[in-house]
Regions:
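Hydrophobic alpha-helical transmembrane segments of multi-pass membrane proteins
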Residues: 19-26, 42, 52, 88-100, ...
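Hydrophobic alpha-helical segments of multi-pass membrane transport proteins
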Residues: 50, 57, 138, 146-147, ...
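Hydrophobic, membrane-embedded alpha-helices of multi-pass small-molecule transporters
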Residues: 16-21, 25-29, 57-127, 185-190, ...
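Extracellular/periplasmic helix-exit of transmembrane alpha-helices
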Residues: 53-71, 115-116, 130-163
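Membrane-interface loop-to-helix entry segments
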Residues: 2-5, 11-60, 65, 69-73, ...
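A generic transmembrane alpha-helix motif of multi-pass inner-membrane proteins
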Residues: 80, 215-269, 282-302
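Membrane-interface alpha-helices at helix entry/exit sites of multi-pass transporters
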Residues: 17, 118-134, 211-219
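Inter-helical loop and helix-membrane interface segments of multi-pass membrane transporters/permeases
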Residues: 1-18, 67-88, 154-174, 208-211, ...
């Protein structure tokens, strides 16, 4: 985000870091209600605005779409890439960056999903699976088309990358104003992501301690790290640390999913059975799962 602001507006990373740290502190000290309000306003604006811009570019360059799709498929699954190990590298890189985009399999998103008030857990599970589709298949594909339809990226040539590459690709399509649009979109996206991840951290902290002091320490650390991350010259060190950490998260969570699969299947079958019986909105009844340690108060319909 700081790189996008510096490239489009010429603002030094340190000033972006200071502003972002102040805004983050304001929100995290406001509690979950303020966090939810910020996310409700910010995320739809970011997603719809960016998708709309990408669709405009795709429509303008509709004749080049078949060639771009062919290029993607050829370079991902071609014989030359497979023999040279390129396909494996592409898959590995895709998995790593895919986790950054949607967190599927990490076990972090359920903490936020659990805040929602729903009649049945499967209902929220369906919504969560849709979010993965929107994040990766729609938004990330939009970015790929924007870059590949432009004339900024040259395969095999070392040059700009990351958000600056996307900015310059947008400029090549629709003019200089596009980099300001993307800067605003990145600001909205990154800020909402910071708030979201803070909530995950606070939620996880309660497992170990639930004191006011511990929450204040966490908030101070988050604000400080936001400043340091924004003012750092590049993201290489962040990815170097995050990649193995996400691998550990995924390993632990996937093992838990395997262990919980029988219970999850029972809950899913309960949802399907109610639909077959004509229920428009299935309701979760803990009494049907009396053998499990379920807090009945968590599923009371007031």
């Amino acid at each position: 985000m700081a790189g996008a602001v510096q490239d489009s507006l010429g603002v030094d990373r340190i000033w972006t870091g200071i502003l972002l740290a102040v805004l983050t502190g304001f929100v995290v000290y406001g509690g979950i209600k303020r966090i939810a309000h910020v996310a409700d306003v910010v995320v739809p604006i970011m997603a719809l605005g960016y998708i709309g811009m990408a669709l405009l570019i795709i429509v303008i360059n509709i004749g080049d779409i078949p060639a771009v799709i062919a290029l993607i498929v050829k370079n991902a699954f071609g014989l030359e890439e497979a023999v040279g190990g390129g396909m494996g590298a592409a898959v590995a890189q895709g998995l790593r960056r895919g986790l950054f985009s949607n967190e599927a399999g990490l076990g972090s998103a359920p903490n936020v999903a659990a805040v929602a008030y729903v009649r049945h857990p499967v209902s929220q599970g369906i919504v969560q699976s849709l979010s993965v589709f929107i994040d990766t298949i729609i938004i990330c594909s939009c970015t790929a088309f924007v870059i590949l339809l432009g004339d900024v990226y040259v395969a095999g040539v070392q040059g700009i990358d990351g958000v600056v590459l996307t900015q310059q690709s947008l400029v090549s399509h629709v003019g200089g104003w596009a980099q300001y649009f993307l800067t605003a979109a990145i600001l909205l996206f990154a800020f909402s992501s910071i708030i979201y991840n803070y909530y995950l951290g606070e939620n996880a902290l309660t497992v170990f301690t639930d004191t006011e002091i511990s929450r204040h320490v966490l908030r101070i650390l988050i604000v400080g790290l936001v400043f340091l991350g924004s003012s750092a010259p590049g993201a290489t060190s962040v990815f170097f640390f995050s990649d193995p950490m996400m691998g550990i998260l995924a390993l632990v969570n996937l093992l838990a999913i395997i262990m919980l699969f029988p219970i999850g299947l029972r809950v899913l079958n309960d949802y399907r059975d109610q639909l077959r019986q004509g229920a428009e909105h299935p309701v979760f009844d803990p009494a049907r799962f009396s053998d499990l340690d379920i807090d009945a108060n968590a599923w009371r319909l007031d």
